[in-house]
Regions:
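Short beta-alpha connecting loops at secondary-structure transitions
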Residues: 16-17, 80-87, 191-195, 558-560, ...
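Terminal leader/tail segments of proteins
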Residues: 2-15
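Short, contiguous acidic and Ser/Thr-rich linear segments
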Residues: 21-29
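A basic, amphipathic helix-loop patch mediating RNA/tRNA/ribosome contacts
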Residues: 31-65
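Catalytic alpha/large subunits of respiratory electron-transfer oxidoreductases
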Residues: 103, 107, 156-158, 162-163, ...
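Fe-S ferredoxin-like electron-transfer domains
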Residues: 2-4, 58-237, 241-245, 250-253, ...
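N-terminal leader/propeptide and maturation segments of large enzyme subunits in energy/redox metabolism
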Residues: 108-140, 146, 583-639
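Short, structural beta-strand-to-alpha-helix junction motif
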Residues: 29-33, 61, 336, 497, ...
């Protein structure tokens, strides 16, 4: 009879009894997962939720009625009427024996091991192990300590318990096969293939999947204990993919980035570029105080109020003598949605300029189809076209999703140069029913042509455009562009693109420039940027770090780094994700949303909110139904109001 509260009987579920408790679970579920559903913990080392079971550690052995011997819970699937016991005398004795064997040669490194406090061997020994060992401590086998495998990873073979996770990670997740098992039997060791250094762009995941302290981060060596860290959920700031992370900080500094599993985005993996970018957020090279730098006169640090008053006075002067169109505004793909929402309102509604952008090149007309392919949807495609882009550089973790689609789901992945004719691409696909096209922003038009060529023969053709910056997609959604308003509505008064704004400033036609946030995209402008900055009468910079813009600004207002403020960002597929403040700001200046609100008030706006990020977020969602429907963690889609 089904357990109380369980769904009705059907062929896809079975009834199982574990430690006297009945539960209904899918028939393809492992005993390990069925026990977890009841809150019953079964210790294990080799099993990992993202990898296939191998049952090599033998820690998860359980008793199953009608089976002649104990069975591994990580590799045994449930069946109807199965009765499992996880803690009888036989099971307990075997667990104690396995732990005793694992500790025979394990060093007494806990006080100096970087895994201390988050080590499964340490935890399970206390919880399930014997009170004492029958083996003498003096007979332990020793190896070289802390052998560097790369600039990021160290290996301590004395601590290795041969769970095979690292080997399987390279076999199943990345396909790079950089770590192998050497020797056989009791001589078995984990090492890099042929002793070569690790070259993978995803090696930083190794210490996270290692259940002990055998593989550790060199950057985190002897830095902290987990109980001394303050953990904050965030989003990786290195690219537009939107990998979820935990930011661990201590003593007002970021100590490490740790993956935070989101199966719809990152599948719990991080790239090394993102994981090891955290030292940049501890940099002492910061803009800390407001300052004014008149074209003639002496630069000086001032109060925030004086800096904003000076900025508004300079902007009003340009508007009065020329017009609002004599002001150019630059946003940044590093800013939050809330900041970008206010910036485009400030530009269009208060200053009166259509000249606003966050990039240099013109933004071509948007096709709603660019938003249809979600990251998780990649696995459901029969064929994938990677068009003229290198995910390894633009969005590294995307390559792991492509590998999974190809090697676990059977999809065919075609990497195609941007110049290949659309009909040739269609011929290569060969009539696959479900097709995904992945391109970067420079190849959007070609991606559209390929989609049209494939549309007649495929049941579905969906596209994903890789944007630049942590919030490049958000900047476009929210209208930080010269030719479209928020929600991709066509502007009745289109302005100049970023490069054209700089050209006009260098020619003396644009007299004032307002910059919000660091903007690496401007570096491609070369000396044009410097000529524009020198020629402009007023340059207002709200920024976090010294830059060429800050160097030539007439008014500088400190900004908050992405780890120092709350808000939201939108990833490459349109997923709106919340970020939280992890560190105290390096400046006493309030967050950019409050600075922009105050500046708008100085320029004559009367209907703006307080600048509180939550209030700005509410106003933004009220104006954009797609963002309101997306909520926190959903996708903002612009195809007939659909939201996934």
């Amino acid at each position: 009879m089904p357990a109380e509260g369980n769904p009705p009987q059907d062929s896809s579920h079975v009834d199982v009894v574990i430690d006297g408790r009945e539960v209904r679970v899918p028939k393809d579920m492992l005993v390990l997962d069925a026990a977890a559903k009841l809150g019953i913990h079964i210790p294990i080392y080799c099993s990992h939720p993202k990898m296939e079971p191998v049952a090599v550690c033998r820690m998860c052995l359980v008793h199953i009625e009608r089976f002649p011997k104990l069975q591994p819970a990580c590799a045994t699937y449930v069946s109807d009427g199965m009765v499992v016991t996880t803690n009888n005398t036989e099971v307990v004795k075997v667990r104690e024996g396995m732990l005793e064997f694992l500790l025979v040669n394990h060093p007494l490194d806990c006080p100096v091991c970087d895994r201390g406090g988050e080590c499964d061997l340490q935890d399970f020994t206390f919880r399930y192990g014997p009170g004492a060992s029958r083996f003498p401590i003096t007979d332990k086998v020793h190896f070289s300590k802390a052998v560097p495998l790369s600039e990021h990873i160290e290996l301590d073979q004395e601590r290795c318990i041969l769970c095979w996770r690292c080997v399987r990670y390279y076999d199943e997740i990345t396909g790079e096969k950089e770590i192998v098992l050497e020797q056989r039997g009791v001589e078995t060791l984990v090492n890099t293939f042929n002793g070569e250094p690790l070259r993978s762009a995803f090696q930083g995941n190794l210490p996270e999947i290692c259940p002990v302290g055998a593989l550790t981060h060199r950057e985190y060596r002897f830095k902290s204990r987990p109980w001394d860290l303050q953990r904050t959920a965030g989003v990786c700031p290195e690219c537009s993919y939107g990998c979820n992370i935990n930011i661990d900080s201590r003593d007002f500094a970021v100590q490490r980035f740790v993956s935070r599993d989101n199966p719809l985005v990152d599948d719990m993996w991080l790239c090394d570029r993102g994981r090891y970018s955290f030292p940049a957020w501890n940099s002492t090279e910061r803009v800390r105080r407001p300052s004014v730098h008149p074209r003639r006169g002496t630069a000086a640090d001032v109060s925030l109020g004086e800096a904003i008053s000076t900025a508004s006075r300079e902007l009003r002067d340009v508007i009065a003598k020329q017009s609002g169109a004599s002001v150019g505004v630059f946003g940044s793909a590093q800013s939050t949605n809330e900041e970008l929402w206010l910036l485009q309102r400030l530009a269009r509604d208060v200053i009166g300029t259509p000249h606003i952008d966050h990039q240099l090149e013109p933004f071509l007309d948007l096709s709603a189809a660019e938003h249809e392919l979600g990251i998780a949807d990649i696995e459901e495609c029969d064929a994938l076209v990677v068009l003229g882009t290198e995910p390894e550089a633009e969005a590294p973790v995307l390559t792991l999703r492509l590998y999974k689609a190809e090697h676990k789901r059977g999809a065919r992945v075609h990497r195609v140069d941007a110049g290949v004719d659309a009909k040739q691409v269609g011929a290569a696909i060969g009539g696959a029913p479900r097709v995904g096209i992945i391109a970067d922003e420079t190849n959007r038009a070609h991606a559209s042509a390929v989609a049209s060529a494939l549309g007649k023969g495929a049941a579905s053709v969906r596209r994903l455009t890789i944007t630049r910056g942590i919030n490049g997609r958000g900047a476009k959604d929210l209208g930080v562009l010269p030719n479209v308003l928020p929600g991709y509505q066509a502007s009745s008064r289109p302005g100049n693109s970023g490069r054209d704004i700089l050209e006009a400033a260098a020619a003396g036609d644009v007299r004032a420039l307002l910059f919000l946030g660091p903007n690496p995209a401007l570096e491609a402008a070369g000396d044009l940027l410097e000529r524009a900055l020198r020629k402009a009468r007023s340059v207002v910079a709200i920024d976090t770090r010294p830059s060429i813009v800050v160097q030539h600004a007439t008014v500088v207002i400190p900004g908050h780094a992405v780890v120092e403020k709350p808000g939201s960002v939108t990833n490459v597929e349109g997923r709106v994700q919340r970020i939280r403040q992890s560190l105290p700001p390096a400046t006493t200046t309030p967050a950019e949303t409050r600075v922009l609100t105050t500046l708008a008030g100085e320029l004559g706006a009367s209907d703006w909110s307080s600048g509180d990020p939550l209030a700005v977020n509410r106003a933004m969602r009220e104006a954009l139904p797609a963002y309101a429907a997306a909520g926190n963690g959903g996708r903002a889609l612009w195809t007939a109001g659909a939201v996934a």
